[in-house]
Curated annotation (Swiss-Prot):
Subcellular location field: Cytoplasm
Domain of life the protein comes from: Bacteria
GO aspect biological process, one term: S-adenosylmethionine cycle
Cytoplasm keyword on record: yes
Classification of source organism: Bacteria, Pseudomonadati, Chlorobiota, Chlorobiia, Chlorobiales
Transmembrane segments annotated in the record for this chain: none
Protein's name in the database: Adenosylhomocysteinase
Main localisation: cytoplasm
Function: May play a key role in the regulation of the intracellular concentration of adenosylhomocysteine.
NCBIfam families documented for this protein: ahcY (TIGR00936), PRK05476.2-3 (NF004005)
């Protein structure tokens, strides 16, 4: 499973799955025109030559195409998954067999997860990465927290708040014992991070506001060709895939409660409605609530929805959205799942520690909780990402959008010296990403005449919208 050396080559579930993984990667490549066009554009130019990239992002077949794109562009890459359940073991095996150090397998413990994250930050010769591809911000967090500990070692004496913190601090304690300036050296060599998801971007902005951000960051999530496609259309397909693979339930006729109506929530609400469910939306934001209502969804509180809901989906990026008290009041046989990045949207720890419920594992990532009155609920993927824990995540085509943005962001950070801040990719690159995907689905663009372009004040070749435009 591993090779013994100063720097580990890989750790995956089963390297013999590599051939299967390679066959699926070849299929995905045909569905990911943005990444393949980027490879062709930079063929022979190696714009990432010399870059050491640490990737913390779901180790799926689609991610394998991203990894091999970065390698073809000249980067030295090490990779781990950003979720304990999201790895596709045949994808990890194929990447390991191709010679890329990957540390990921489906069903990691928290200790294993943070060990894997540590491995991607340790390159040959004692070097750290100079670029990070992050999803949720855990690789970035490890560096920043380690840096803080080196400034204040007493942090290691504090009692961890939960199992996740305990596992993370255990790794950081080991690193500190080996080299009490390790993370200062890593941070000094960093050119930047590109962040994939809403939750990770939120972390970056928080660190920037507090003056704690150590290196530049590009917010890939808020590229239009990411948030309005991956978050919306990706979730519209992969949510139902996860629920159905986990439970085989008929969605038509059920009442689905979607908590949150941002881009992800919109995709989930439309997904459930397209299958014939009656959808109830909960929201804190009056604008999003009004949008949901104007789309014909009932908008109310979860407390009122508990009397009707059969399927619950959290999409908020917040914590304690579904509490233990909520779950105790749900209808018999209710299905509870999350599609936000972290597992704290649902109070899973409180449910597991509740003496009035018995947990019965049905199959991997499907647990039944039987309450004392005989009612039960089903929790999917232990409250983690249902589309990746119980299925295979978003389809390749929509991930090509997101990962082309990631690739362009990595080139941008490597080629330029940014000040420490959180940036977005410029509009012309957003439009380029979209343009690369049009031919695959038979789209033909209209071309402005010079007179038309002058009339509305834009270049003939774009960009066509101002930065403040909301798509």
């Amino acid at each position: 499973m591993t090779t013994e050396a100063a720097v580990l080559d890989y750790k995956v579930a089963d390297i013999s799955l590599a051939e299967w993984g390679r066959k699926e990667i070849e299929i995905a490549e045909k569905e990911m025109p943005g990444l393949m066009a980027t490879r062709k554009k930079y063929e022979g130019k190696k714009p990432l030559a010399g870059a050491r990239i640490a990737g913390s992002l779901h180790m799926t077949i689609q991610t394998a195409v991203l990894i091999e794109t970065l390698v073809e562009l000249g980067a030295d890459v090490r990779w781990a998954s950003c979720n304990i359940f999201s790895t596709q073991d045949h994808a990890a095996a194929a990447i390991a067999a191709a010679g890329v150090p990957v540390f990921a397998w489906k069903g990691e413990t928290l200790d294993e997860y943070w060990w894997c994250t540590r491995q991607i930050l340790e390159f040959e010769g004692g070097l750290g990465p100079n670029l990070i591809v992050d999803d949720g911000g855990d690789a970035t967090l490890m560096i920043h927290l380690g840096y803080k500990i080196e400034n204040d070692p007493s942090m290691l004496d504090k009692t961890p708040g939960n199992a996740e913190e305990r596992a993370l601090f255990a790794q950081l304690k080991e690193v500190f014992a080996e080299d009490n300036q390790r993370w200062h050296k890593v941070a000094a060599g960093m050119k930047g991070v590109s962040e994939e998801t809403t939750t990770g971007v939120h972390r970056l902005y928080q660190m920037m506001e507090k003056g704690e951000l150590l290196f530049p960051a590009i917010n890939v999530n808020d590229s239009v060709t990411k948030s309005k496609f991956d978050n919306l259309y990706g979730c519209r397909e992969s949510l139902a895939d996860g629920i159905k693979r986990a439970t085989d339930v008929m969605i038509a006729g059920k009442v689905a409660v979607v908590l949150g109506y941002g881009d992800v929530g919109k995709g989930c609400a439309h997904s459930m409605r397209s299958y014939g469910a009656r959808v109830i939306v909960t929201e804190i934001d009056p604008i999003c609530a009004l949008q949901a209502a104007m789309e014909g969804f009932q908008v109310t509180t979860i407390e009122e929805a508990l009397e009707e809901g059969n399927i619950y989906v959290t999409t908020t990026g917040n914590k304690d959205v579904i509490t233990l008290e909520h779950m105790k009041k749900m209808k018999d046989e209710a299905i509870v799942c999350n599609i936000g990045h972290f597992d704290n949207e649902i109070q899973v720890d409180a449910l597991n520690n509740f003496k009035g419920a018995t947990r019965i594992n049905i199959k991997p990532q499907v647990d039944k909780y039987v309450f004392e009155d005989g009612r039960c609920i089903y929790l999917l993927a232990e409250g983690r990402l249902v589309n990746l824990g119980c299925a295979t995540g978003h389809p390749s085509f929509v991930m090509s959008n997101s990962f082309t943005n990631q690739t362009l962001a990595q080139i941008e950070l490597w080629k330029n010296n940014y000040d420490v801040d959180v940036y977005r990719l410029p509009k012309h690159l957003d439009e380029e990403v979209a343009r690369l995907h049009l031919g695959q689905i038979g789209v033909k663009l209209t071309t402005l005449s010079k007179e038309q372009a002058d009339y509305i004040g834009v270049p003939v070749e774009g960009p066509y919208k101002p930065e403040h435009y909301r798509y």
